[in-house]
């Protein structure tokens, strides 16, 4: 028989058990998670961007994640890719990639990284290839990015060629033949081309210019020692490039139109040529201005030579632009709505992406490729044969 004390302890224990069961049987309400930040309206802010945003490494990296990894970038025209195997290499905000026309006539884009040792697959600025071949260990790829040959590795147990193709980019060729890319690694990019640019390839003011009458002529590049947004501020007003035509040239080129395409591209059409320009971020305080020039089939040398004068004047203007990181740059209010609209878009995209990262408690890199489990296993196979240390493979591929 239990003593009185033992019986009391038994009763108390039973009460605790029953109370615990009642408590834990109640539905538990999960803590409410704050909603993800939403992009604000496109209303133009009256305040310019802070001067520190034009020289900060932190802002530069955030722009790579929030803008250049998510937005559509205007690159070139399909005129430059006239046949199967024709390719062009690009670098945009630190991303190295290339465009290539496949055997079906479709323009594809890929990160310029071999899946074996990250050596560049394309080493020339442009050309025509029969196959995409990495010169490091002989891996080769078809024009659709699929792995065609991986010496020795393709015979390893568990190696899946289908999982080791080149990392693709999203490519859109619009109705006028202009080529756009999006770095977002998702199967479907977060930002669709149509959401940003519907109708830009159907503008009535572009109709006088038949692009079938133009051919690619040359590229030009200029390195400058300030932030890419300084240039985009300038060119976001469509009239800026048009103003480079003065005097006699203006009379000869009465039909000249210019357009800016966020975040960093501009285009100018004339009856004699058209120019595509990009402000490419190289670093927080360094940029590259890159031109692609196309010539009309009927343009005389005299008319076409205007291009060099225009680029020369643009270069002189670029060198004279104020440096936004200088003291007192943003003490006043900018009154030109074009730069303010551009800056408002930059501000909204950076603040929105920063909010997402704060919620996730980590950096979000939309362009970063995510390997599935099979690909991760393949990567471990590569690491087991480091460098040229795999006997027979070393002798075969050590060129």
Where do the PLM segments sit?
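C-terminal catalytic domain of Rieske-type non-heme iron oxygenases
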Residues: 2-10, 16-19, 23-25, 100-101, ...
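N-terminal pre-ligand scaffold of iron-sulfur
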Residues: 13-124, 170-173
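Rieske [2Fe-2S] iron-sulfur-binding domain
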Residues: 81-185, 191
């Amino acid at each position: 028989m239990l003593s009185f004390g033992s019986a009391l302890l038994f009763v108390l224990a039973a009460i605790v058990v029953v109370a615990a069961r009642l408590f834990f049987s109640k539905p538990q309400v999960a803590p409410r998670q704050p909603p993800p930040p939403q992009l604000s309206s496109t209303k133009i802010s009256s305040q310019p961007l802070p001067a520190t945003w034009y020289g900060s490494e932190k802002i530069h990296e955030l722009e790579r994640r929030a803008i250049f990894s998510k937005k559509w970038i205007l690159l070139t025209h399909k005129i430059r890719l006239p046949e199967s195997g024709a390719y062009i290499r690009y670098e945009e905000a630190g991303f190295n990639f290339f465009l290539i026309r496949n055997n079906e006539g479709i323009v594809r884009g890929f990160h310029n990284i071999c899946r074996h040792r990250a050596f560049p697959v394309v080493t020339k600025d442009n050309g025509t290839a029969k196959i995409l071949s990495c010169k490091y260990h002989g891996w080769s790829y078809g024009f659709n990015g699929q792995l065609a040959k991986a010496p020795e590795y393709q015979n390893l147990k568990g190696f899946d060629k289908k999982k080791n193709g080149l990392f693709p980019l999203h490519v859109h060729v619009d109705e006028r033949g202009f080529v756009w890319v999006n770095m977002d690694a998702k199967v479907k990019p977060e930002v669709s081309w149509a959401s940003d640019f519907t109708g830009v390839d159907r503008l009535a003011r572009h109709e006088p210019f038949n692009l079938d009458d133009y051919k690619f002529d040359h590229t030009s590049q200029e390195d400058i020692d300030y932030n890419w947004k300084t240039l985009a501020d300038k060119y976001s007003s469509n009239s800026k490039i048009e103003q480079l035509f003065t005097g006699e040239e203006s009379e000869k080129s009465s039909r000249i139109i210019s357009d800016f395409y966020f975040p960093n591209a501009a285009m100018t059409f004339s009856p004699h040529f058209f120019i595509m320009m990009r402000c490419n971020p190289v670093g927080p305080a360094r940029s590259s201005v890159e031109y692609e020039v196309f010539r009309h089939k009927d343009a005389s040398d005299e008319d076409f030579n205007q291009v060099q004068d225009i680029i020369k004047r643009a270069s002189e203007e670029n060198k004279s632009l104020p440096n936004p990181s200088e003291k007192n740059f943003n003490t006043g209010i900018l009154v030109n709505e074009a730069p303010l609209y551009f800056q408002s878009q930059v501000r909204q995209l950076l603040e929105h992406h920063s909010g997402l990262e704060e919620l996730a408690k980590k950096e979000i890199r939309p362009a970063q490729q995510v390997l599935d489990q099979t690909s991760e296993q393949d990567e471990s196979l590569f690491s087991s044969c480091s460098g040229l240390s795999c006997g027979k493979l070393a002798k075969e591929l050590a060129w």
